[in-house]
Every structure is written in C-alpha cells, then in structure tokens.
UniProtKB/Swiss-Prot annotation:
Required for accurate and efficient protein synthesis under certain stress conditions. May act as a fidelity factor of the translation reaction, by catalyzing a one-codon backward translocation of tRNAs on improperly translocated ribosomes. Back-translocation proceeds from a post-translocation (POST) complex to a pre-translocation (PRE) complex, thus giving elongation factor G a second chance to translocate the tRNAs correctly. Binds to ribosomes in a GTP-dependent manner. It comes from Actinobacillus succinogenes (strain ATCC 55618 / DSM 22257 / CCUG 43843 / 130Z). This is Elongation factor 4. Its main location: membrane. Belongs to the TRAFAC class translation factor GTPase superfamily. Classic translation factor GTPase family. LepA subfamily. GTP binds at D14, H15, G16, K17, S18, T19, N131, K132, I133, D134.
Length: 597
C-alpha cells in the first residue's frame, strides 16, 4: 500500500492536461507506441472534436522509480471547463494529491485558481508543474512567481516540462512519487469503496469506477450499496491501463472498475459507498455535495413518436452525468418533452449533442432560463424554472433573481472593456486586486446574464485572455417581468422569456423583428406581438402572399373587378379565422441569439 499514489491533474482549459496524461501513460508503458494516439483519455467523439475533456477518466500505471521501487500510480484525468467543475471535485475526492498544471506562457487563470482551492480545501497535496516550456513565449520564472503570488503555494521548485516533446516527464513522475502521500486506510477493516463515476454498458449493465478506502473488494463478493441497501454479486472487477484489464481483487487505496450486473440505472448512484453484505461498514463515506442545476431549458423531440426513446436516453445519460436533472413537461406548441437542468450553456450544448449523436434523436430546445425565487402575496415562496410557471402578476409580491459571484482574471490592457461589459450586464463590483500584469476582478452579476452569453462576450472583448469562474451566491430582489410572444393573438408558451423590466421593450422588439424574418409568409397577414401581461410592447406583421385575381379581366366593367376583389377579401378573412401558423425550429433558437449582435 505504501507504493500506491492516487493523484489527478487540475488545470485551466488548454493548459495541456490531456497531453501530459498521454506522456505519463507512454512513459510508464500503459500502451505500446502503436496503440498510442493523441488524447487517449478523451474517448468521446465530442471531446476530441471540441478539444475539451468532459468526463473524468482513470488509469492505473506502474512506474519503476529511481530508488528501485515500483510504484502503482492511479491517475484520474479531470475536465478544466467551468461547467464541469463538479467532475473535478468528484475526481479529487478519490485522490491524495493533485498536479497543478500551468501553461508557462499564459500563467495562472481563473479555473486554475478555483480548482486549486477545491483541492486545498480537501487537504490534498498540490504539486505545481510548469508545462509548455518548449514554446518561445514561455517565461517559467514569471509564472512561478505568479503561482506564489495568486495561488499562494511554493512554486520556485516547480518541475518544468513540455508534455508535447516529452521533456521533463521523468521529473514529474519522481515528484509524484516523493511529494504525494500514500493512501491511508485499513486493509482489515470492513469494506468501504467510494463510487466516483458510473456509466451504462449495453452488455454488462452498470459499470462503476470505485476507490477502495478501507478493506478489500474481491471477485465473487456479495456487496451492498449503502444508500439503497440493495445487494449484488461482484461479477468482474479490474483496472484501466487505459484498456480494461480484469483482476481478482482491489485492495485498499486502489482505484478500479466493478461490474455487478446492476440493471437499474439508479442502482449505483455516484458518490455512494459500497460495502460487504455480511460484514457491513458502520457509516457511509462522505460523498460529494449535490450540484444544483443553474440553467433550465425545455427539450422536445421533433416527432412525438420519439418520446419513449428520448426518455430512455435521458435516463442513461443521467447515470453517467450526475448533474443532469430532468422532469416531464408539456407545451401547447411543442407537445410532450422534458424540462432539463444543466450547469451552464456548454453543458447544455454537450448534452443536446450527445442525445442527438449517441441516441439518434432530433430535438427542439427552448430558451434557457435560470431559477427565480418568487414570493407570492400570501407569503408563500415558490421556485420558478420556466416562464410558463410564473404566477399571474397580481399574485406576485416579489421576484428575486439568482446572483452569481464571478471571479475574473484579466490582463491590464483589457480591463476597461471587461468592466464595461460587466456594467452592461447589471454587475456590481465587489473586489479588485492587482497581481503584476494580471488583475483579479470580482463582480456580482445576475445569473441570467452570466449563463446566456457572458462567457463568449468576455472572451471576445479581451481577445481570449480573460478567464472566468462563477458560483451561485444568493437571491436578490429585482424588477423582472415575463414577455410573451403572441402570433395572431395566440400566446406561444415556448417563446416566452423572463427579463428585467429595463431590457423588456428592447428584447421584445428585437425578438419580434427576428421572428418576422423566420416565419414563412402565408396567404393572410400574421401579426407577431410581444406583450407584458395585457400591454403590447412591440409588434410586426408578416405580410400576406396575394394572388392577382384581376389578371384575367382585360377591359370590362369596374363592378366586375370589385366583385372579384370582394370575393378574395372574404376568402382571406375566412382563412385567417381557420389558418394555423407553423413556427419553424429556427424561431425557437432565435431567442438564444437575441441581444448578441
């Protein structure tokens, strides 16, 4: 056990976590050179295309150190994007140490900080590593000072390496062996194993990634899941060397996978504890804090026949992704679907793309909203995650919107642009600290403004140099109203949005103009209106298509022409009473882009 090291890698997006993990695997001979490919651990197609890590993955490597001993390194790769920070905290719970990878050219960024603080709170040993020192722009001295200044850990001794060329990888491995403590735990105590992650395999059922804290887990053991009390037989277990390798047992301190033929998707929840059925542990291990979704959106299948398949797909995805929340919802415009909760817009895009790719579904998404706290006139408090659930105006005493605390690291020359952006988003500055050329800004910004397009705008105003980390802080009173979109006098529930009163007229007018371009012309006029309650704030009309009924009258009497025109007019009138307007898919997506350009 003293030769086991459990660690994960934390870093900002694009600072080279996945490339470094490739080199570690190659150096320790986890895969032969023939099987090696770039970003081995990013196994999802989506991860490769976007170049980001979404799911945490684990690998067990054997490393023969310079002191002659062979160490077992259990290494868990973590995502760097702010939307996936819950994946990071899960990975860290299974480790004793973390490598803090910082790009020697770019220096410390906001996510590096956030993830690093998470690690320090969990009492992990943080080992700084300066990556990409082969780049001409690398300045390891300055970055080492930055780490000490901003993060506050000793970095003068930090290992310098280049994951791309393989320089300094041996030194990184030696640091891991010497600095990160061995796992603690009692091999003879009753079994306690923490479920770090679960996913669904069509042949094996639920596969769980576990970290054994105490005791031993053997093939053929009878185990039970502590939260549900269900008992299972261990059919197979083993480790990843990235390839799945079977073993007969997992001992204290090891990380590996377990298959117990669990058919039910909710059979092995993430963060739960496994123990023996006959000799159970007295208490469960502390799990992870439940993540609350920050953004809600309705997802509806384009054809209603796909509803069942859609429900099953969501079930399988939610097993793999603990932070996905969903409940059934019906809409008069779109039929049956689900209201889903996500951690952020990137998370929402990825889930939608995974549903469309892996499960072959066609989906319509409604505009994302955040959760509002609404106090009714009778003193009752309700939480509203969709505009259609907002109570009537005369029943509402107070609407409180969620405020996010945003920590940004901004280079000095872009400070003005970023402050302008924050003010435009109704932000309030709470702190500002200078660290050399970088400035740490803290703003309280309404969550609704942050989740829509704040991240993209922040990147574009600062040419990609500013970085952001945000977390929910509190609810605060605000003058929010619901803007309804009406087409020919009928409210379309899927197009409603909750906005601040100051922006309502502007957003309403913009949305109405956009809808005018997207709704195809019919044989009659279509009136598109935006309204708050009964007050219409914007309107535009899609003009009718009109057939020239006088084409065949050459000369002749004017009363003949009048008769034909009158007949056409009556026909149009009747058509308008009966006619239905098809709202195309693009119109629902238009809401997302309102206020961007």
């Amino acid at each position: 056990m003293k030769n086991i090291r459990n660690f994960s890698i934390i870093a900002h997006i694009d600072h080279g976590k996945s490339t470094l993990s490739d080199r570690l695997i190659q150096t320790c001979g986890g895969l032969s050179d023939r099987e090696m490919e770039a970003q081995v651990l990013d196994s999802m197609d989506l991860e490769r295309e976007r170049g980001i890590t979404i799911k945490a993955q684990s690998v067990t490597l054997d490393y023969k150190a310079k002191d002659g001993e062979t160490y077992q390194l259990n290494f868990i790769d973590t995502p760097g994007h702010v939307d996936f920070s819950y994946e990071v905290s899960r990975s860290l719970a299974a480790c004793e140490g973390a490598l803090l990878v910082v790009d020697a050219g770019q220096g410390v960024e906001a996510q590096t900080l956030a993830n690093c603080y998470t690690a320090i709170e969990m009492n992990l040993e943080v080992v700084p590593v300066l990556n990409k020192i082969d780049l001409p722009a690398a300045d390891p001295e300055r970055v080492a000072e930055e780490i000490e200044d901003i993060v506050g850990i000793d970095a003068m001794e930090a290992v310098r390496c280049s994951a791309k060329t393989g320089l300094g990888i041996e030194e990184v491995l030696e640091e891991i062996v010497h600095k990160i403590p061995a796992p603690e735990g009692d091999p003879n105590a009753p079994l306690q194993a923490l479920i770090i992650d679960s996913w669904f395999d069509n042949y094996l059922g639920v596969v769980s990634l576990v970290r054994v804290k105490n005791g031993m887990l053997k093939k053929g053991d009878k185990i039970k899941v502590m939260s549900t009390g269900q008992a299972y037989n261990v059919d197979r277990l083993g480790i990843f060397t990235p390839k799945q390798v079977d073993r007969t047992e997992l001992t204290t301190g090891e990380v590996g996978w377990v298959v117990c033929a669990i058919k039910d998707i909710l059979g092995a929840p993430v963060g739960d504890t496994l123990t023996h059925q006959h000799n159970p542990a007295t208490a469960a291990l502390p799990g992870f804090k439940k993540v609350k979704p920050q953004v809600y959106a309705g997802l509806f299948p384009v054809s209603s026949d796909d509803y069942e398949a859609f429900r099953d797909a969501l079930g399988k995805l939610s097993l793999n992704d603990a932070s996905l929340f969903y409940e059934p919802e019906t809409s008069s415009a779109l039929g049956f679907g689900f209201r889903c909760g996500f951690l952020g817009l990137l998370h929402m895009e990825i889930i939608q793309e995974r549903l469309e790719r892996e499960y072959d579904l066609d989906l319509i998404t409604t505009a994302p909203t955040v959760v509002y706290e609404v106090e009714l006139t009778n003193g009752e408090v309700v939480y509203v995650d969709s505009p259609s659930k907002l109570p009537p105006l005369n029943n509402i005493g107070d609407i409180r919107e969620p405020i996010a605390e945003c920590n940004m690291l901004v280079p000095q020359e872009y400070l003005g642009n970023v402050i302008t952006l924050c003010v435009e988003k109704r932000g309030v500055q709470t702190n500002m600290v200078y660290h050399g050329n970088q400035i740490a800004l803290t703003y309280d910004i309404p969550m609704g403004e942050v989740v829509l397009d704040f991240f993209d705008r922040l990147k574009s105003t600062s040419r990609g140099y500013a970085s952001l980390d945000y977390s929910f802080k509190r609810f605060q009173s605000a003058n929010m109203v619901r803007v309804d979109i009406m087409i020919n006098g009928d409210r379309v529930d899927a197009l409603a949005l909750i906005v601040h009163k100051d922006n309502a007229v502007y957003r309403g007018r913009e949305l109405v103009e956009k809808m005018k371009e997207l709704i195809p012309r019919q044989q009659f006029d279509i009136a598109i209106q935006a309204a708050i309650g009964n007050q219409v704030i914007a309107r535009s009309t899609v003009k009718q298509l009109r057939k020239n009924v006088l084409a065949k009258c050459y000369g002749g009497d004017v009363s003949r022409k009048k008769k034909l025109l009158q007949k056409q007019k009556e026909g149009k009138k009747r058509m308008k009473q009966l006619g239905n307007v098809e709202v195309p898919q693009e119109a629902f997506l238009a809401i997302l882009h309102v206020g961007k350009d």
